[in-house]
Swiss-Prot record:
S-S bridge residues: none
Protein keywords: Cytoplasm, GTP-binding, Hydrolase, Metal-binding, Nucleotide-binding, Ribosome biogenesis, RNA-binding, rRNA-binding, Zinc
Protein name, UniProt field: Small ribosomal subunit biogenesis GTPase RsgA
EC code(s) of this entry: 3.6.1.-
Domain called CP-type G: residue spans: 85-242
Region (Disordered): 1-20
Species name: Neisseria meningitidis serogroup A / serotype 4A (strain DSM 15465 / Z2491)
Gene encoding the protein: rsgA
Amino acid sequence: MPSEHPFSDGISTPNPKETMNDTAQITASYGRRYIVRTPDGTTYEASTRKKRVDFACGDRVRISPVNAEQVVIEDFLPRQSLLYRQDAWKTKLIAANVTQLLIVTAAVPSPSVRLLQRALLAAEAAGIRAVIVLNKADLPETALWREKLKFYETLGYPVIETRALENAGSLRPALQGHSNILLGQSGMGKSTLTNALLGSQTARTGDISAALDSGKHTTTHARLYDLNGETQLIDSPGLQEFGLHHLQAADLPRYFPDFRHLVGQCRFHNCTHRAEPGCAFKAAAETRAASPERLAFLQGITDELPG
């Protein structure tokens, strides 16, 4: 009798060497351990060769069988996108092949403008559509934060209000047809939103959590879910910082919707947008055609980038 795979919902698993498709998608990542799913829906525990860690949740990969329950990831297939962060010491892959980043914020606990702005820059650099989710919108503390988010709407970033303890219905139309990732600080309600969106699928997360030695729904690693045949959702761990050392200083202005139209308009081609005469960026900030705070943010990010 074929052995029964613990993550296949009770469906028996035939001999993998006879039936396994050699491609799969990573649906959970935890260090160098992964869960992958083949096109026929079968899931396997997966490891990598030579301690490789350059794989991300959402990656489509080539695999080789080890036994009925385990495979080895050989390499990843070409990526549509890669969202990651990098500081002076290390690079952290967040997700691959996503088409939409949903930055989950809330007035409680205290939201980070710094994290929001950095995540938006990373999305712009990766060519990923960004949406801001104002969660816990029914809290009385929300009014001030809602007002601050109006600025980002003027830059072209949609702001969607949700109440995670309800059904997250306001979010569903925006997710449709995208490979989505929820990202934000700890405590903003990402996992609660995920539960609300998944409905009956939520119970399955316990098995994957057990396989990766984590709590039932404490998000310590990224996980991918299918909302329907056209829509995927990745829930990611909470974070407090978003390093941008992978960006090039010369490219930064193009990632600012409020400044990109000024690229090439300064008097000097190597303008640092600080003290040079004829700086279009400074002129825009001085006349309030652009935000002085945003120019200061651009200057600050430029200063911290290597080289």
